[in-house]
UniProtKB/Swiss-Prot annotation:
List of residues binding Mg(2+): 12, 108
The protein's name: DNA polymerase IV 1
Xref: HAMAP family: DNApol_IV (MF_01113)
Annotated organism of origin: Bacillus subtilis (strain 168)
Protein role: Poorly processive, error-prone DNA polymerase involved in untargeted mutagenesis. Copies undamaged DNA at stalled replication forks, which arise in vivo from mismatched or misaligned primer ends. These misaligned primers can be extended by PolIV. Exhibits no 3'-5' exonuclease (proofreading) activity. May be involved in translesion synthesis (TSL), in conjunction with the beta clamp from PolIII.
Record carries keyword DNA repair: yes
Pfam families given in the database record: IMS (PF00817), IMS_C (PF11799), IMS_HHH (PF11798)
Length: 414
């Protein structure tokens, strides 16, 4: 993309939940602190922990009992989301004093485009000032990455924690990023890293030099995007309106009673797949990644995902992927809630399906029927026409809710 080089900051608050608790209670400072989902039960999971706790071997997602074994003096606190949201709002208020182009990414991190601001000629000094203000005014530590694009800024902010400021220029990518394991690259999860290793790609540098067609076959449209990022190329703008957009489309259903009945649970998934499919089609987008959520009777919650070779929006495709994930990861214990979410959305007209002969014949055969059913159901009600498999166990046993992130809803209101 032609034009002058941009100046992008990525602000990442350090151990945010634990830091907020320390800000509210000075007696906690300097002590090993963890915030856990269920403090009273030993099987609760650590959501975040202070650096003092990390130094003693405590890690995020670690069960509380295990964390206590590593650090017997660990102070475990329940989450206080009102407190975290208030601190988040205060943090973003400070950031917006420097530029209107602030893009919140989550409750504790965001991007700033400083290119056309009075601060562009003294980026490092401004970053130090922002970091100092967050520490003094909110008592919250942060790390800041400075780079010509969002991807590099994010990678830079991860390099020095806590209280780090890192400048990462595109010309430094070969020396600084390329030697790193590919799994340390932003946007590459554990499963993607394993797939890349199957191609002999172990470092970011090897990804940067990889064959684009091989990456596309392996990871779909995300493959070439990751290669660009590995080469320091990322043109996405800092977009303050991005939080108002649907980053995902999903629904969850809470069962009226805890159940381990397979047919009943599959019935819930059928309804969820239909709902997600309908919403994707109304928005004229398709999902490149699918998540399921399983919440057990003891409130332990897991999410599992799959990256799709081709984007999908049809109910049957969504259901097939959701069922596969469910039976792969369900431990047979009673379930309280199920959810399906499609993410990595792409516009329908930009998406394409690489069909083999079998799937082409199946799609060609089903498409007129699917379209007729969708039109009639939209006109006369969603229960007018259904396939035989969906008729079984149709009694209403669930309460539907949409997935939403409280933080993004909160940002929209503010």
């Amino acid at each position: 993309m032609p034009g002058k080089s941009r100046i992008i900051f990525h602000i990442d608050m350090n151990s945010f939940y634990a830091s907020v608790e320390m800000a509210y209670d000075p007696a906690l400072r300097g002590k090993p602190v963890a915030v856990a989902g269920n403090v009273k039960e030993r099987k609760g999971i650590v959501v975040t922990c202070s650096y003092e706790a990390r130094a003693r071997g405590v890690k995020t997602t670690m069960p509380v009992w295990q964390a206590k074994r590593h650090c017997p003096e660990l102070i475990v606190l329940p989450p206080n989301f009102d407190r975290y949201r208030n601190s988040s709002r205060a943090m973003f208020t400070i950031l917006r004093e420097y530029t209107d182009l602030v893009e919140p990414v989550s409750i504790d991190e965001g991007y700033m485009d400083m290119t056309d601001t009075p601060y562009s000629s003294r980026a490092l000094e401004t970053a130090k000032e922002i970091q100092s203000r967050l520490q003094k005014e909110l008592l919250l530590p942060s790390s800041i990455g400075i780079a010509p694009n969002k991807f590099l800024a994010k990678m830079a902010s991860d390099m020095k924690k806590p209280l780090g400021i890192t400048i990462l220029r595109k010309r430094q990518v070969p020396d600084i990023l390329w030697p790193l394991p590919v799994g340390e690259m932003h946007g590459v999860g554990k499963k993607t890293a394993e797939k890349l290793k199957g191609l002999g790609i172990h470092t970011i540098g090897e990804l940067a030099a990889a064959d684009e067609h091989s990456l596309k076959r392996l990871l779909g449209i995300n493959g070439p995007r990751l290669k660009n990022k590995a080469n320091g190329i990322h043109h996405a703008p800092v977009d303050p309106e991005r939080i108002y957009e649907f980053k995902s489309v999903g629904n969850s259903s809470t069962l009226s009673h805890d159940s381990s009945d397979e047919e009943e649970l599959l019935g819930v998934f059928r309804k969820l797949a239909a709902s997600v499919s309908d919403r994707l089609q109304r928005k004229e987008v398709m999902a490149s990644k699918l998540f399921i959520m399983i919440r057990y009777a003891d409130w332990r919650t897991i999410t599992r995902s799959t990256t799709l070779r081709n984007p999908i929006d049809q109910k049957n495709d969504i259901l097939k992927e959701a069922e596969h994930l469910f039976f792969k990861h369900w431990n047979k214990n009673p379930v309280r809630l199920l959810g399906i979410t499609g993410t990595d959305l792409v516009e329908k007209e930009q998406a394409y399906k690489q069909l083999d002969l079998f799937s082409f014949n199946e799609d060609a055969k089903d498409e007129p029927i699917q379209q007729m059913m969708e039109k009639l159901n939209k006109k006369y009600g969603t229960k007018l026409i259904r396939k035989g498999a969906t008729l079984k166990k149709e009694e209403s046993k669930t309460k539907g809710t949409s997935f939403n992130k409280d933080f993004f809803q909160d940002e929209k209101k503010s």
